[in-house]
Design a protein with these regions (language model features):
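Short beta-strand segments
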Residues: 15-18, 52, 66-68, 141-142, ...
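Short, solvent-exposed loop/turn segments at secondary-structure junctions
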Residues: 19-22, 55-58, 71-74, 101, ...
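Conserved core segment of the aminotransferase class I/II
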Residues: 39-118
Length: 175
């Protein structure tokens, strides 16, 4: 649906932070369509700018970032960055290249993340199903990747649920 949007403003842009693009917890992670293959069909090739980084893979605040966009958007971004950035952290970029070597190296590293994280996700899902399943008071989904489980509770209950979770030592992210 996004590629088919018809925004009023010619310079309307969607900046998509695809922060969890390689954070699969299972071998059958979600497969997203390549939006950049679809955008031209609707004459919207300049509408989306996708960003991602290794910040949640290697070093928070010191990862290597990437921008995926149309040629027009890349040209505009380069022009702006040329003025804003004196120099990139080339040593940090080199460290990442030497560590990962290529995309397969990133995927192999992320399998290590999944080995650590999946049991924790499974534990949370099991507790949700055991304590709340079938009661009609909350819903959630079992994610195949990322770092979050979305929990939806009954209207008017979110604040109290957050307080109770905090007392139990569980951190919730407000949305």
């Amino acid at each position: 649906r996004i590629p088919a949007l018809n925004p009023s403003a010619e310079d309307f842009r969607i900046i998509w932070d695809n922060a969890y693009c390689v954070h699969d917890l299972t071998d059958d992670g979600d497969k997203l369509a390549n939006i950049f293959d679809i955008l031209p069909k609707y004459n919207n090739e300049d509408m989306v700018i996708e960003v991602c980084s290794t910040a949640k893979i290697t070093f928070p605040g010191a990862g290597v970032s990437a921008i995926i966009a149309s040629d027009n958007n890349i040209a505009a971004i380069k022009k702006r960055l040329n003025v804003e950035t004196i120099s990139y952290d080339k040593m940090n970029q080199q460290r990442h290249v030497q560590f990962f070597k290529n995309a397969d190296g990133v995927r192999a590293h992320m399998k290590k993340h999944a080995k650590i994280l999946k049991p924790k996700f499974d534990m949370v899902i099991n507790h949700l199903e055991k304590e709340l399943g079938g009661k009609g008071i909350a819903s959630w989904f079992n994610p195949k990747g990322g770092y979050f489980i979305s929990l939806d509770v009954m209207n008017g209950c979110a604040k109290r649920v957050g307080e109770l979770c905090k007392e139990a030592g569980v951190t919730l992210t407000n949305v």
